């Protein structure tokens, strides 16, 4: 079962704005050596909205090759076009991804029947597991717990959810409707601790781009019901969890990664570089977590 800390990987770019393949592979390797439980390329944090389909597919291929089955690869395969999502999911399966992460369609605002149709089409097209990505703040729509229940009941490869609603009670509601084996991963570092207490089994994390060891330790503690240890780790990470979202992501987490020498800060427009004020707050958060030393 997929569980623990799974990094929503950033996509490093070179000075010309092209994908820095060497930096990406080195970054994935560092994540694994730091003890991360899984990686998720080409999601929101990976700047999927500004990647071409060719770049999207290439990153998945690079990630699968670098990981070499040491941890699960949960490849982003979302689109607001069902046919495009099916194409991306098929490619991820062919490339060797262990699962796909599929966001609810954004902008065109389908109803619950439309959501069911979208995800059922993808489930019929591939055999690897599907994680539903429910993030109303970005997609405008919220998948109802009942729709999720129907999808996991009707399609055995729809196995879980990345829940970025920020509502920790959702974990209990989804556990009740979808069953105890339904894989519930938080999509929000700030509320992941509480989400886990309600039945979650980990987080697809932004902060773990720079703090994979701490994040893995936090979620391991949760899985062992050691919430005293988890709370101490959460206290270390909370300023970072907040700071990297002061300005539109992933500018903040890329800046943090650059401070640790992991990649450059370049983001693709319309995301823009950070203000000096935000940089200072992120620096302070990195010191607080012990990731930067005086």
Curated annotation (Swiss-Prot):
Residues at the active site: 133 (proton donor/acceptor), 162 (schiff-base intermediate with substrate)
Main localization of the protein described in the UniProt heading: cytoplasm
UniProt-annotated location(s): Cytoplasm
Pathway this chain belongs to: Amino-acid biosynthesis; L-lysine biosynthesis via DAP pathway; (S)-tetrahydrodipicolinate from L-aspartate: step 3/4
Annotated GO MF terms: 4-hydroxy-tetrahydrodipicolinate synthase activity
A Gene Ontology cellular-component term: cytosol
Any Pfam family the entry gives: DHDPS
GO biological process: diaminopimelate biosynthetic process; lysine biosynthetic process via diaminopimelate
Positions contributing to pyruvate binding: 45, 204
Reaction(s) the record says it catalyses: L-aspartate 4-semialdehyde + pyruvate = (2S,4S)-4-hydroxy-2,3,4,5-tetrahydrodipicolinate + H2O + H(+)
Keyword Transcription on entry: no
Homology family: Belongs to the DapA family.
Function, as annotated: Catalyzes the condensation of (S)-aspartate-beta-semialdehyde [(S)-ASA] and pyruvate to 4-hydroxy-tetrahydrodipicolinate (HTPA).
Oligomer status and interactors: Homotetramer; dimer of dimers.
Protein name in the entry: 4-hydroxy-tetrahydrodipicolinate synthase
Annotated source species: Bartonella henselae (strain ATCC 49882 / DSM 28221 / CCUG 30454 / Houston 1) (Rochalimaea henselae)
Gene: dapA
């Amino acid at each position: 079962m997929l569980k623990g800390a799974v990094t929503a990987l950033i996509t490093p770019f070179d000075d010309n704005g092209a994908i820095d393949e060497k930096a990406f592979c080195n970054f994935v390797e560092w994540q694994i050596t730091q003890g991360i439980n899984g990686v998720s390329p080409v999601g929101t944090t990976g700047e999927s909205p500004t990647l071409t389909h060719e770049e999207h597919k290439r990153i998945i291929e690079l990630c699968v090759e670098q990981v070499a089955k040491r941890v699960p690869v949960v490849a982003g395969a979302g689109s607001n076009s069902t046919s495009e999502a099916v194409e991306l999911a098929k490619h991820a399966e062919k490339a060797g991804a262990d699962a796909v992460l599929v966001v609810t369609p954004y902008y065109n605002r389908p109803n619950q029947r439309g959501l069911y149709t979208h995800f059922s089409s993808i489930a019929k097209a591939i055999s690897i597991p599907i994680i539903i990505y429910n993030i109303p703040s970005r997609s405008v729509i919220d998948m109802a717990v009942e729709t999720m229940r129907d999808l996991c009941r009707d399609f055995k490869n729809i196995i879980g959810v990345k829940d970025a609603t920020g509502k920790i009670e959702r974990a209990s509601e989804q556990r009740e409707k979808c069953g105890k084996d339904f894989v519930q991963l938080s999509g929000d570092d700030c509320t992941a601790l509480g989400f886990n207490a309600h039945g979650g089994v980990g987080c697809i994390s932004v902060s773990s781009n720079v703090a994979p060891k701490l994040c893995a330790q936090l979620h391991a503690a949760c899985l062992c019901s050691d919430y005293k240890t988890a709370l101490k780790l959460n206290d270390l990470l909370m300023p970072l969890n907040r700071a990297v979202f002061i300005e539109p992501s992933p500018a903040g987490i890329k800046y943090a990664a650059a401070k640790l020498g992991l990649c450059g800060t370049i983001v693709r427009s319309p995301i823009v570089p950070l203000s000096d004020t935000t940089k200072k707050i992120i620096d302070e958060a990195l010191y607080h977590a012990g990731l930067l030393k005086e």
